[in-house]
Amino acid sequence: MTQPNPNKQIVELNRTSLFWGLLLIFVLAILFSNYFFN
């Protein structure tokens, strides 16, 4: 039995979590800038 490469799934998961982390930081930065500059 040949299984799919588990390393590929781990890389995809890390890329997805990195994307969501950056998106979360971006949204928080917008919210904080609106809060401080108004």
UniProtKB/Swiss-Prot annotation:
Its main location: plastid. Pfam families: PsbL. GO terms for cellular component: chloroplast thylakoid membrane; photosystem II reaction center. It is a single-pass membrane protein. The chain crosses the membrane at residues 17-37. InterPro entries: PSII_PsbL, PSII_PsbL_sf. It comes from the Eukaryota. Keywords: Chloroplast, Membrane, Photosynthesis, Photosystem II, Plastid, Reaction center, Thylakoid, Transmembrane, Transmembrane helix. One of its GO terms (biological process) is photosynthesis. It is found in: Plastid, Chloroplast thylakoid membrane. PSII is composed of 1 copy each of membrane proteins PsbA, PsbB, PsbC, PsbD, PsbE, PsbF, PsbH, PsbI, PsbJ, PsbK, PsbL, PsbM, PsbT, PsbX, PsbY, PsbZ, Psb30/Ycf12, at least 3 peripheral proteins of the oxygen-evolving complex and a large number of cofactors. It forms dimeric complexes. Belongs to the PsbL family. One of the components of the core complex of photosystem II (PSII). PSII is a light-driven water:plastoquinone oxidoreductase that uses light energy to abstract electrons from H(2)O, generating O(2) and a proton gradient subsequently used for ATP formation. It consists of a core antenna complex that captures photons, and an electron transfer chain that converts photonic excitation into a charge separation. This subunit is found at the monomer-monomer interface and is required for correct PSII assembly and/or dimerization. This is Photosystem II reaction center protein L. It comes from Chara vulgaris (Common stonewort).
